[in-house]
Every structure is written in structure tokens, then in C-alpha cells.
Amino acid sequence: MSCRILLRRPRALAVSLFALIFTSGAPSIAQQIPQVVVTATRSEQAITDTLASTTVLTREDIRDTQATDLPTLLRSAAGIEVAQNGGPGTAASVFMRGGNSSHTLILLDGVRINSSTLGATALERLTLEQIERVEIVRGNVSALYGSEAIGGVIQLFTRQGGGAPALGGSLTTGSRGTLSGNLDYGGKVGDTRFYIGLAGFHTSGFSAINPDTNAATRAAVNPDNDGYRNTTVNANVSHLINPRNEVGLRLYETRGLVNFDSAFATPTTAHQTRNSTSSFTAYSKNRILDAWRSTLTFSKSVDSSDQTLNFKWDGHIRTDQRQLTWQNEIALAPTHKLLLGAESLSQRAESESTTSRFYPARQIGSVLAGYSGSVERAEFQLNLRNDRYSDFGRTNSYFAAAGYNFTNEWKAIAQQSTAFKAPTFNDLYFPNFGSPNLLPERARSQEFGFQWAAGVHLLRVTRFRTDYTDLIVSAGTPARATNVAKARVNGVETHYNGQWFGFDLRTNLTLQDPVSVPADAVTGPQLRRRARAFGNIGVYRSVGPWRFGADLYATNKRVDTDITAFPSQKVGLASYNLLTLTARYNVTKEIYIAAKVDNATNAQYQLVHGYNTPQRGFFLTFGYQPK
């Protein structure tokens, strides 16, 4: 049965996935220490104990997929869809469980790096060479993290030093003039850990917009290739003063230059954006009492972009966020933990163009409390949070979940939560569009599911529903930002990680119904760029010094709007399958050679109507990584 047929029949895809997992003749279950995560509760917890649906992508997963950027890596995770306006470096959006792209909070080592003007995060800028681990928590967790965490949270952890100081690096070359490199040095000397890494990326790319989409684009779009280059630095140092106290500093900065197309220009018009994302963190971790751990953190992040039109200045946007966080974890008993915290966040922005300028700012004060624990076979988690915004006032959110272990391997989980997203500065103050009296967007979610955790196997099936209210859209004449839209997403999400007959298997499937209530006047009930069925199967096998892999992503059709039509018109985005083939050869324990065939079947597809996507590509990597 082909993947195309499976996606036309979502139930058949679900049955096939379960048949693959629960096949006869399964191997004996090996014992394995569960991965430890922190994002699901803001404190350390085994992934098998999390009540929120959580996925971890490790450094080994990144090596296996050989993903060139963060959007490509995230596409392989459960519940996540990605849209992008062209090739590497162009604007990318993440839709988690059918929510809007601004409904996913992105954290870098715990630091907010989103734009307070646009509301989303420029994740296309974040290079994977300096990422050690990605933790993904799906579902409403505003009670833990505040605004934007409606669809979930994606937290990126940068690489850090450990062990004897050593030098590492890699060099990749491939199709479309792609060249990337990474050099890092880190380790531990006495009670001090340190790391510094440098990464660079360049690609000649391809034309972002297909000029043959229609007559309008043929008259407006520059057909030249839209290239991208990026440089990244990641540095951190920490010192253990004594067994109870640690201090540290982290610095991350990435700068890029991307060429892009506009459907409303001429075939000779040149568009460029210079952008940067940076974060700085200073922290102190202190064990005040044996049962009381306290962390005080100051962080600053900056997101900026400068656009040029025909190499002349055309606009500037900058977001500056400064946050002070005091978090306390108190062990009430061996299986009972209390979380108490307070945050102060300052947001400022600069938005300048040839026609308008505004410089908004606001202050946010937050307090949060949480409990997690277990009594015999029952597990519980409760989180409460209050946020006070200087522009629209107070808002409360909660997260309540319970689990019951039928056996040591099988567990039932249920949860309910509320969440919110604060209006962006553009929503509130953009000239001739913003409305300063806007309310935050709201959401309420319910989930119920089962988990099977046995040795190397982890399977989770979740039934979820999220209702959105007060969504901010453009409405009226003249158009203004208004709290009038509603949406609802019902779905079932399945993901499995494990080993069978020597193969490492990572699979997921999401069946969902993302609808606007009432139906959108142009695109109808289905939310734009979101499919009703999509999934991923990754299979990897080690044979001696070799490591082979195949990764198949498949999605069914979506709807979008024509980028050139006025008034807007509904268009369809066809279903597609993407196959990636990888191989890695370990020359020694430290030296390796890796190869990848991206889009191996040369599938023709679109993530955004009118925008091109990468064709088949070949990539070769040489690397040295000390063990």
C-alpha cells in the first residue's frame, strides 16, 4: 500500500502504523534508563513520567537525520507541521496541533527569542550545529510559561562542554552551492566547564517564488536564485563554587543575510534582509537546603532585521526582551515536589519603514506555582500562573493532569488546561491597523491518552481538543486588528520510539480536524496550511562502522490563499511524500563521513502557495567529534 493511498485513508495509516509497532516475534525488552527532561514541569523528570505529551530530539537524532536546519528537524516530530516561503533562511512557520504559528513558544536555553512585533520566532535562523537537544511539549502550557504557549513549547538547549577539553568540527558540501562548517572547543577543567562553538552556512538557493504560478507572478517576480548565508557563535562557562552553588554565563548569536522574492514587484527587483537573533544569560543555581533548590536567572534577547529594496534601506524591526526569573523547587517528600516562581519581563520594540515608525514598550510581572507528585499508582500535576501586562491587565491560566499506572508499563493520562496569547505590538499599535484595546487570545484544551513504556520502547496515543476564542484577525473597513475569530482543533496523535530486530524506529501520526468557527469566507472551514493527516517514519540501522537511515514524511492536502489574487481566492496544496536517505561511516571513534540524499524521489510540492521548495539534493559531510 503506497503512502499516498494511506494518506487518503487516515484510518488505514493508523492501522498500518500499529501493525508495524506491534508485529509478532518482537524481541525481548531491554532495560534502559529513561531520558530526563525539564520543559514539561520546569524541573527534572524522566520522560516516561511526564503527563504532558513530550518528545526529545537528541544530538544523536540530529546526526541521524542530517537535517540542515531547524524547520527540517522539527518536521520529523509528532504534531508539528512546517510552512516556509522558499529555501533555507526564508520565513518559516510552525503549526503545533493545528494552532497558529504564533501559538508555539520557542525557548533557547530557557530564554524567549520571539519577536514581540510579529509574535512568531525566526526559527529558520537557528543552526543545528550548536544545538545539543530539543524538547517539545505539546498542548496548552501557559500555566508554566505564559503567553504563546497555547499549542506548546519547543525548547532548544545549546551545546556545552564536559570531560577533557577537546576540539571538534565538521564540514558539509552539497547541492545548490551549499557549504557549511562548524568548529568547537570545550571541556571541563577542575570545577569549571566551558564551551565555544562557531558555525557558518551558505547556499546559493533557488528562486523563492515560482514565476510561472500565474500571469501576475511572471510580470512581478525576479527569477534569480535567492541565496542565504549565516554565521553563529555559541559560548558558555559555568563554575561549581561548591557542591551546593553554581554560577554560569551563556551567549548565543546568529546573523544572516537572505535574498527573497515579492509577488508585487518587478523581475529585476532585489529584496534582501539582514537579520540577527541573540541571547545572553547569567544564572546562579543554589541548594539553599537539602530539599530546596533555587535558581536566579537574568536573560536578555534581541531579534532584529533590516530590509533593503534594490540595495537601499527599506525597513528596520528590533525586539528587545529582558527577563529576571526566580524559580524554587522544594521536595516535600520523595515523590512530591512544589514549584514556586516569579518573573519580570520587559519588552521593547522598534519598527521603522519608509512610511511609518513606532516604538512600543510594556512590562509583564508573573507569579507561578506548581505541584507534581504520585500516590501509589496515581500521578498528579497542577500548575497555576498569573500574568499582569501593563497594556491590557491581568490574565490567569492553569494546567491540571492526572495519570494512573495500570501496570509498570501501561498508564492512562487525562488533562485539562487554559492558555493565552498576548496581543503583539503590531496588533496593538501598528499605524492604521492596531487596536490598543485588544484582549489576549484564549484557549481551553482537554486531552486523554495511554502510554506504553517498556525498556527501549515508548508509545503514546493522545486524543486532544483545543477551543480558541478571541483570535485576533483583520476585520472591518478600514481593516483593523479585532478579537472576533474562533477556531477548534480535534485530533488524535500517536508517536513511538523504540528498537525492533536491530532497527531504531521513530514514528508518529497525527489525525486532526483544524477548523475555523464559523468557516472562513475565503478558505472555508479548514485552517490555512494545516493538514488533516500527516506523519513521519524514521528507520535507522547500525552495521559495523556504518549507520544507515531512511526518513519518510507524508501529509495530505491543505488549503491556502492565492498570493496575487484580489480579492483573495482559495487554492489547494496537494498531498506529498518526502523521502530522505542517509549513511554515516565511522572511520575511527572520532572521525566520520556522512552522506545524505534529500527529497530522494524529487517530489514536487508546496508548503505555501506559489513558493518553491527544494528539489532532490546530495550532501556530503566530513566530521571530527572526540568521544
Give the location of each predicted region:
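Outer-membrane beta-barrel signature, preferentially recognizing the C-terminal barrel domain
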Residues: 266-279, 283-287, 317-320, 361-362, ...
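Repeated loop/turn-to-beta-strand initiation elements of outer-membrane beta-barrel proteins
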Residues: 191-194, 244-247, 257, 288-296, ...
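Short acidic/polar hinge/loop motifs at secondary-structure boundaries
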Residues: 111-138
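Extracytoplasmic beta-strand/coil segments of soluble accessory domains associated
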Residues: 34, 71, 75-111, 115, ...
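Outer-membrane beta-barrel domain signature, strongest for Gram-negative TonB-dependent receptors
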Residues: 221-338, 342-347, 458-459
